[in-house]
Amino acid sequence: MVVAKKSLGQHFLTDESFLDRIVDALPPLNPLKLIEIGVGLGDLTLKLLDHYPLKTYEIDSSLCEKMRSKLKAQKKPFALELVEKDALFLKEEEPYFLISNLPYYIATRLVLNALKDPKCRGLLVMAQKEVALKFCAKDSQNALSVLTQAIGNATLLFDVPPSAFSPPPKVFSSVFEVIKEPLKEKALASLLQAPFFEEALQKGFETLEDFLKACFSSPRKTLSNNLKKSVSYREKLDKVLDFLALENQPTSVRASEIKDYLKLLEYLLKG
Protein backbone atom coordinates (compact mmCIF):
# COMPACT_ATOMS: atom_id res chain seq x y z
CA MET A 1 0.00 0.00 0.00
CA VAL A 2 1.28 3.44 -0.97
CA VAL A 3 1.07 6.12 1.73
CA ALA A 4 0.71 9.71 0.49
CA LYS A 5 3.61 11.94 1.50
CA LYS A 6 2.61 15.28 2.99
CA SER A 7 6.04 16.69 2.15
CA LEU A 8 5.26 16.23 -1.56
CA GLY A 9 1.67 17.46 -1.31
CA GLN A 10 0.32 14.10 -2.47
CA HIS A 11 -3.44 13.64 -2.81
CA PHE A 12 -4.22 10.85 -5.26
CA LEU A 13 -7.24 11.25 -7.54
CA THR A 14 -9.05 7.89 -7.43
CA ASP A 15 -12.61 8.67 -8.57
CA GLU A 16 -13.08 6.99 -11.97
CA SER A 17 -15.66 9.49 -13.20
CA PHE A 18 -13.34 12.46 -12.69
CA LEU A 19 -10.38 10.60 -14.18
CA ASP A 20 -12.48 9.95 -17.29
CA ARG A 21 -13.59 13.59 -17.47
CA ILE A 22 -9.97 14.75 -17.46
CA VAL A 23 -9.01 12.38 -20.28
CA ASP A 24 -12.10 13.38 -22.27
CA ALA A 25 -11.23 17.08 -21.84
CA LEU A 26 -7.90 16.75 -23.67
CA PRO A 27 -7.88 18.66 -26.97
CA PRO A 28 -6.55 17.09 -30.20
CA LEU A 29 -2.81 16.64 -29.62
CA ASN A 30 -1.31 15.60 -32.96
CA PRO A 31 1.58 16.34 -33.48
CA LEU A 32 2.28 17.39 -29.86
CA LYS A 33 3.89 15.11 -27.30
CA LEU A 34 1.88 14.53 -24.13
CA ILE A 35 3.79 15.22 -20.91
CA GLU A 36 2.44 14.35 -17.46
CA ILE A 37 3.68 15.69 -14.13
CA GLY A 38 3.26 13.20 -11.29
CA VAL A 39 2.37 9.56 -11.82
CA GLY A 40 0.50 9.26 -8.51
CA LEU A 41 -1.05 5.82 -8.13
CA GLY A 42 -1.03 5.51 -11.91
CA ASP A 43 -4.79 5.76 -12.40
CA LEU A 44 -4.71 8.75 -14.76
CA THR A 45 -1.49 7.55 -16.40
CA LEU A 46 -2.99 4.17 -17.29
CA LYS A 47 -6.09 5.78 -18.79
CA LEU A 48 -3.94 8.13 -20.89
CA LEU A 49 -1.91 5.18 -22.19
CA ASP A 50 -5.09 3.80 -23.77
CA HIS A 51 -5.05 6.81 -26.11
CA TYR A 52 -1.57 8.38 -26.30
CA PRO A 53 2.15 7.70 -25.90
CA LEU A 54 3.17 9.47 -22.70
CA LYS A 55 6.19 10.87 -20.90
CA THR A 56 5.74 11.28 -17.14
CA TYR A 57 7.93 13.09 -14.61
CA GLU A 58 7.79 11.74 -11.05
CA ILE A 59 10.09 12.65 -8.16
CA ASP A 60 8.92 9.87 -5.79
CA SER A 61 10.93 6.70 -6.46
CA SER A 62 8.39 4.47 -4.68
CA LEU A 63 5.61 5.65 -7.02
CA CYS A 64 7.87 5.06 -10.03
CA GLU A 65 8.49 1.50 -8.85
CA LYS A 66 4.77 0.89 -8.35
CA MET A 67 4.01 2.24 -11.83
CA ARG A 68 6.57 -0.04 -13.46
CA SER A 69 4.99 -3.02 -11.69
CA LYS A 70 1.54 -2.04 -12.91
CA LEU A 71 2.74 -1.80 -16.50
CA LYS A 72 4.22 -5.29 -16.30
CA ALA A 73 0.87 -6.62 -15.10
CA GLN A 74 -1.28 -4.90 -17.73
CA LYS A 75 -0.29 -4.14 -21.30
CA LYS A 76 -1.26 -0.84 -22.86
CA PRO A 77 -1.49 0.14 -26.56
CA PHE A 78 0.91 3.05 -26.07
CA ALA A 79 4.29 3.32 -24.35
CA LEU A 80 5.22 5.20 -21.18
CA GLU A 81 8.54 6.97 -20.70
CA LEU A 82 8.85 7.36 -16.93
CA VAL A 83 11.39 9.97 -15.81
CA GLU A 84 12.38 9.94 -12.14
CA LYS A 85 13.05 13.66 -11.81
CA ASP A 86 11.73 16.85 -10.22
CA ALA A 87 9.26 18.40 -12.69
CA LEU A 88 10.46 21.87 -11.73
CA PHE A 89 13.43 21.08 -13.96
CA LEU A 90 11.32 19.79 -16.84
CA LYS A 91 12.92 20.65 -20.18
CA GLU A 92 11.69 19.32 -23.51
CA GLU A 93 13.21 19.81 -26.94
CA GLU A 94 9.96 19.25 -28.86
CA PRO A 95 6.55 20.95 -28.60
CA TYR A 96 4.33 19.33 -25.99
CA PHE A 97 1.02 19.52 -24.13
CA LEU A 98 1.05 19.25 -20.33
CA ILE A 99 -1.39 17.30 -18.17
CA SER A 100 -1.27 16.91 -14.40
CA ASN A 101 -2.97 16.62 -11.03
CA LEU A 102 -0.61 19.21 -9.62
CA PRO A 103 0.77 19.05 -6.06
CA TYR A 104 -0.86 21.94 -4.20
CA TYR A 105 2.33 23.35 -2.74
CA ILE A 106 4.08 23.94 -6.09
CA ALA A 107 1.10 24.18 -8.46
CA THR A 108 1.55 27.88 -9.20
CA ARG A 109 5.27 27.51 -9.95
CA LEU A 110 4.67 24.56 -12.26
CA VAL A 111 1.94 26.35 -14.22
CA LEU A 112 4.09 29.49 -14.56
CA ASN A 113 6.99 27.35 -15.78
CA ALA A 114 4.72 25.83 -18.43
CA LEU A 115 3.38 29.22 -19.52
CA LYS A 116 6.93 30.56 -19.81
CA ASP A 117 8.20 27.54 -21.76
CA PRO A 118 7.82 28.16 -25.53
CA LYS A 119 7.79 24.39 -26.13
CA CYS A 120 4.64 23.99 -24.03
CA ARG A 121 1.69 24.66 -26.33
CA GLY A 122 -1.00 24.22 -23.72
CA LEU A 123 -1.95 22.54 -20.49
CA LEU A 124 -4.80 20.72 -18.79
CA VAL A 125 -4.21 20.59 -15.04
CA MET A 126 -5.92 20.26 -11.70
CA ALA A 127 -5.01 22.53 -8.80
CA GLN A 128 -6.53 23.93 -5.65
CA LYS A 129 -9.72 25.74 -6.71
CA GLU A 130 -8.48 29.08 -5.37
CA VAL A 131 -5.36 28.84 -7.55
CA ALA A 132 -7.32 27.75 -10.63
CA LEU A 133 -9.68 30.71 -10.24
CA LYS A 134 -6.74 33.12 -10.18
CA PHE A 135 -5.30 31.77 -13.44
CA CYS A 136 -8.72 31.80 -15.12
CA ALA A 137 -9.95 35.18 -13.87
CA LYS A 138 -10.96 37.68 -16.52
CA ASP A 139 -9.68 41.23 -17.02
CA SER A 140 -6.83 42.28 -14.70
CA GLN A 141 -8.02 40.86 -11.39
CA ASN A 142 -4.60 39.53 -10.37
CA ALA A 143 -1.06 39.04 -11.69
CA LEU A 144 -1.61 35.37 -12.60
CA SER A 145 -4.66 36.11 -14.75
CA VAL A 146 -2.83 38.91 -16.58
CA LEU A 147 0.14 36.63 -17.31
CA THR A 148 -2.13 33.86 -18.55
CA GLN A 149 -4.18 36.14 -20.79
CA ALA A 150 -0.98 37.63 -22.22
CA ILE A 151 0.05 34.29 -23.70
CA GLY A 152 -3.13 32.27 -24.21
CA ASN A 153 -6.74 31.57 -23.29
CA ALA A 154 -7.68 29.98 -19.96
CA THR A 155 -10.88 28.06 -19.27
CA LEU A 156 -12.13 26.73 -15.93
CA LEU A 157 -13.62 23.32 -16.77
CA PHE A 158 -15.00 21.68 -13.61
CA ASP A 159 -14.58 21.32 -9.85
CA VAL A 160 -13.46 18.16 -8.06
CA PRO A 161 -14.61 17.51 -4.46
CA PRO A 162 -12.27 16.30 -1.68
CA SER A 163 -14.07 12.94 -1.66
CA ALA A 164 -12.57 12.13 -5.09
CA PHE A 165 -9.07 11.88 -3.59
CA SER A 166 -7.12 9.61 -1.28
CA PRO A 167 -6.37 11.07 1.19
CA PRO A 168 -9.02 13.77 0.77
CA PRO A 169 -7.65 17.34 0.86
CA LYS A 170 -9.33 20.02 2.95
CA VAL A 171 -10.29 22.10 -0.08
CA PHE A 172 -11.98 21.71 -3.45
CA SER A 173 -9.88 21.34 -6.58
CA SER A 174 -10.58 22.56 -10.11
CA VAL A 175 -9.50 21.40 -13.55
CA PHE A 176 -8.58 24.15 -15.97
CA GLU A 177 -7.09 24.49 -19.42
CA VAL A 178 -4.76 27.01 -21.03
CA ILE A 179 -4.19 27.04 -24.78
CA LYS A 180 -1.32 29.16 -26.10
CA GLU A 181 -2.20 31.70 -28.82
CA PRO A 182 0.46 32.46 -31.48
CA LEU A 183 -0.68 36.08 -31.97
CA LYS A 184 -0.44 36.77 -28.25
CA GLU A 185 2.98 35.11 -28.15
CA LYS A 186 4.14 37.32 -31.01
CA ALA A 187 3.05 40.46 -29.15
CA LEU A 188 4.80 39.30 -25.97
CA ALA A 189 8.00 38.44 -27.85
CA SER A 190 8.06 41.89 -29.46
CA LEU A 191 8.70 43.55 -26.09
CA LEU A 192 12.42 42.74 -26.15
CA GLN A 193 15.18 42.15 -28.68
CA ALA A 194 16.56 38.61 -28.95
CA PRO A 195 18.16 36.64 -31.81
CA PHE A 196 15.53 33.88 -31.72
CA PHE A 197 11.74 34.04 -31.31
CA GLU A 198 11.58 31.52 -28.46
CA GLU A 199 14.23 33.43 -26.52
CA ALA A 200 12.39 36.71 -27.08
CA LEU A 201 9.12 35.11 -25.96
CA GLN A 202 10.65 33.77 -22.77
CA LYS A 203 12.31 37.11 -21.97
CA GLY A 204 9.08 38.96 -22.70
CA PHE A 205 7.16 36.69 -20.34
CA GLU A 206 9.76 37.08 -17.57
CA THR A 207 9.77 40.87 -17.97
CA LEU A 208 5.98 41.03 -17.75
CA GLU A 209 6.04 38.69 -14.74
CA ASP A 210 8.57 40.89 -12.94
CA PHE A 211 6.58 44.03 -13.74
CA LEU A 212 3.33 42.50 -12.47
CA LYS A 213 4.95 41.48 -9.19
CA ALA A 214 5.71 45.15 -8.61
CA CYS A 215 2.27 46.32 -9.73
CA PHE A 216 0.34 43.83 -7.57
CA SER A 217 2.68 43.87 -4.55
CA SER A 218 -0.10 45.43 -2.43
CA PRO A 219 -3.34 44.92 -4.40
CA ARG A 220 -5.41 47.30 -2.25
CA LYS A 221 -3.00 50.19 -2.75
CA THR A 222 -2.81 52.32 -5.88
CA LEU A 223 -0.60 51.30 -8.76
CA SER A 224 1.51 54.41 -8.21
CA ASN A 225 2.17 53.58 -4.56
CA ASN A 226 3.20 50.04 -5.45
CA LEU A 227 5.63 51.18 -8.14
CA LYS A 228 7.16 53.78 -5.81
CA LYS A 229 8.38 50.86 -3.67
CA SER A 230 9.89 49.02 -6.65
CA VAL A 231 13.62 49.41 -7.21
CA SER A 232 13.19 48.41 -10.85
CA TYR A 233 10.26 50.67 -11.73
CA ARG A 234 10.15 53.66 -9.37
CA GLU A 235 12.17 55.75 -11.84
CA LYS A 236 9.56 55.06 -14.52
CA LEU A 237 6.66 56.32 -12.43
CA ASP A 238 6.34 59.56 -14.45
CA LYS A 239 5.96 57.53 -17.64
CA VAL A 240 3.31 55.38 -15.95
CA LEU A 241 1.37 58.52 -15.05
CA ASP A 242 1.73 59.77 -18.64
CA PHE A 243 0.32 56.46 -19.88
CA LEU A 244 -2.65 56.65 -17.51
CA ALA A 245 -3.42 60.15 -18.80
CA LEU A 246 -3.31 58.92 -22.40
CA GLU A 247 -5.69 56.08 -21.49
CA ASN A 248 -8.04 58.43 -19.61
CA GLN A 249 -7.47 56.58 -16.36
CA PRO A 250 -7.00 58.41 -13.03
CA THR A 251 -3.68 58.37 -11.19
CA SER A 252 -5.47 56.68 -8.27
CA VAL A 253 -6.13 53.42 -10.14
CA ARG A 254 -5.31 50.12 -8.50
CA ALA A 255 -3.41 47.39 -10.30
CA SER A 256 -6.62 45.44 -10.95
CA GLU A 257 -8.09 48.41 -12.86
CA ILE A 258 -5.44 48.65 -15.58
CA LYS A 259 -6.98 47.78 -18.93
CA ASP A 260 -3.94 46.62 -20.91
CA TYR A 261 -0.73 45.69 -19.10
CA LEU A 262 1.11 44.67 -22.25
CA LYS A 263 0.43 48.08 -23.76
CA LEU A 264 1.61 49.78 -20.55
CA LEU A 265 4.82 47.75 -20.37
CA GLU A 266 5.55 48.36 -24.05
CA TYR A 267 5.11 52.10 -23.42
CA LEU A 268 7.60 51.96 -20.53
CA LEU A 269 10.16 49.95 -22.48
CA LYS A 270 9.93 51.69 -25.86
CA GLY A 271 8.02 54.90 -25.38
UniProtKB/Swiss-Prot annotation:
InterPro entries: KsgA/Erm (IPR001737), rRNA_Ade_diMease-like_C (IPR023165), rRNA_Ade_Mease_Trfase_CS (IPR020596), rRNA_Ade_methylase_Trfase_N (IPR020598), rRNA_adenine_dimethylase (IPR011530), SAM-dependent_MTases_sf (IPR029063). It is found in: Cytoplasm. Gene3D superfamilies: Ribosomal RNA adenine dimethylase-like, domain 2, Vaccinia Virus protein VP39. Pfam families: RrnaAD. Signal peptide: none annotated. SMART domains: rADc (SM00650). S-adenosyl-L-methionine binds at H11, L13, G38, E58, D86, N101. It catalyses: adenosine(1518)/adenosine(1519) in 16S rRNA + 4 S-adenosyl-L-methionine = N(6)-dimethyladenosine(1518)/N(6)-dimethyladenosine(1519) in 16S rRNA + 4 S-adenosyl-L-homocysteine + 4 H(+). Its main location: cytoplasm. This is Ribosomal RNA small subunit methyltransferase A. It comes from Helicobacter pylori (strain Shi470). The gene is rsmA.
